[in-house]
Amino acid sequence: MNVEEMKKIAAKEALKFIEDDMVIGLGTGSTTAYFIKLLGEKLKRGEISDIVGVPTSYQAKLLAIEHDIPIASLDQVDAIDVAVDGADEVDPNLNLIKGRGAALTMEKIIEYRAGTFIVLVDERKLVDYLCQKMPVPIEVIPQAWKAIIEELSIFNAKAELRMGVNKDGPVITDNGNFIIDAKFPRIDDPLDMEIELNTIPGVIENGIFADIADIVIVGTREGVKKLER
């Protein structure tokens, strides 16, 4: 089973948690894109009804529209029943690093408020500790990026401004901000680090999601594995 197949089986498993009349937070990224597609197909077949999606990004919004999923913004709903999203890393306590899609701020706002937060990953994303493989994305005010990189040196982080791939200059978030990717030696206390990074002036939000995931669905070569807090 290849990586894309692992993503697909994780996305399919997440559909089991979706019921009629739910408000669903729709995450960002390649694994969640499979979930949105499958959710739209299930809706079209009449196997589920009266759902509303709350997208965490323009990518999620456009995918939901493409697959005929009714959508609303966060301020148009009273509550979010379940949120489904991917992650860049998952540690043994189900703490996460997220934000490679540069949508981490709205993801955290929506997923923090969800009754149940379900994370979809393939087996490569499981790590012994956060920052083992991936940096922590940090959304920052554009004018502050250089000062914040200097501040991050206190944590022995190797930090750099994320540059665009198909555009000149830095990546711009949906909120009009920049992204700094900070690689720390290791993160032993994710909650403490998450809070501390957000105290730096100019930081909007960071990609550590500590103590927030309820269920992690892992696509593996052998099939689906479910981890719960």
Curated annotation (Swiss-Prot):
Role: Involved in the first step of the non-oxidative branch of the pentose phosphate pathway. It catalyzes the reversible conversion of ribose-5-phosphate to ribulose 5-phosphate.
Protein name: Ribose-5-phosphate isomerase A
HAMAP family listed in its UniProt record: Rib_5P_isom_A (MF_00170)
Presence of the UniProt keyword Isomerase in the record: yes
Subunit structure: Homotetramer.
Superkingdom of origin organism: Archaea
Organism: Pyrococcus horikoshii (strain ATCC 700860 / DSM 12428 / JCM 9974 / NBRC 100139 / OT-3)
One GO term describing the cellular component: cytosol
GO process terms (BP): D-ribose metabolic process; pentose-phosphate shunt, non-oxidative branch
Enzyme nomenclature, EC number: 5.3.1.6
Keywords tagged on the record: Isomerase
Primary enzyme class: isomerase
Effect in UniProt of substituting residue 125 to A: 2-fold decrease in the catalytic efficiency and strong decrease in the binding affinity
Reactions this protein catalyses: aldehydo-D-ribose 5-phosphate = D-ribulose 5-phosphate
Active-site positions on this chain: 107 (proton acceptor)
